[in-house]
């Protein structure tokens, strides 16, 4: 592959519809817009979701659910990610943030058991899954809930 062989992704670029001059051009007179009507006008066209006056789908379907104001959003960290730290390191939410493992603290950090931990670490977090807690302790490390 060379620079001059690069092509934009399919459908990412749209060719501007050029208006013809005269009927013979195939795109003159009404410029492909047909005769009169809303779509022939400047700025014409219906809004998103408009179905010609029929009750639109989004209004025919019932509302569902609610937003729980007490919901807690935890930053998730898997065991396999903890292997990047040295043996005997005290892993805290601040350290995870500093090293770029998590992008923001949200309502705390939760450690999940995806992957395996091979190092002896002291892990401090807000929540642990039971299997993650067992795996850290089995590797000789310790777990502390903040």
Swiss-Prot record:
GO terms for biological process: translation. The keyword Ribosomal protein applies. One of its GO terms (molecular function) is rRNA binding. Keywords: Ribonucleoprotein, Ribosomal protein, RNA-binding, rRNA-binding. Residues 1-13 have a biased composition (Basic and acidic residues). Residues 21-31, 42-52 have a biased composition (Gly residues). Pfam families: Ribosomal_L27A (PF00828). Residues 1-52 are annotated as: Disordered. GO terms for cellular component: cytosolic large ribosomal subunit. InterPro entries: Ribosomal_uL15 (IPR030878), Ribosomal_uL15/eL18 (IPR021131), Ribosomal_uL15/eL18_sf (IPR036227), Ribosomal_uL15_bac-type (IPR005749), Ribosomal_uL15_CS (IPR001196). Belongs to the universal ribosomal protein uL15 family. Part of the 50S ribosomal subunit. Binds to the 23S rRNA. HAMAP family: Ribosomal_uL15 (MF_01341). This is Large ribosomal subunit protein uL15. The lineage of its organism: Bacteria, Bacillati, Bacillota, Bacilli, Bacillales. The gene is rplO.
């Amino acid at each position: 592959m060379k620079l001059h062989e690069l092509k934009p992704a399919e459908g990412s670029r749209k060719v501007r519809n050029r208006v013809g001059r005269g009927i013979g051009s195939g795109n003159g007179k009404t410029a492909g817009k047909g005769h009169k009507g809303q779509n022939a006008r400047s700025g014409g066209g219906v809004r998103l979701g408009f179905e010609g006056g029929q009750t639109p789908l989004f209004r025919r379907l019932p509302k569902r659910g609610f937003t729980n104001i007490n919901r807690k959003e935890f930053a998730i960290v898997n065991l396999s990610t903890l292997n990047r730290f040295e043996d005997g390191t005290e892993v805290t939410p601040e350290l995870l943030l500093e090293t770029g493992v998590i992008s923001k603290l949200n309502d705390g950090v939760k450690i999940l058991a995806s992957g395996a931990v091979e190092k002896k670490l002291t892990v401090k977090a807000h929540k642990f899954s039971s299997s993650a807690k067992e795996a850290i302790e089995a590797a000789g490390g310790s777990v502390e809930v903040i």
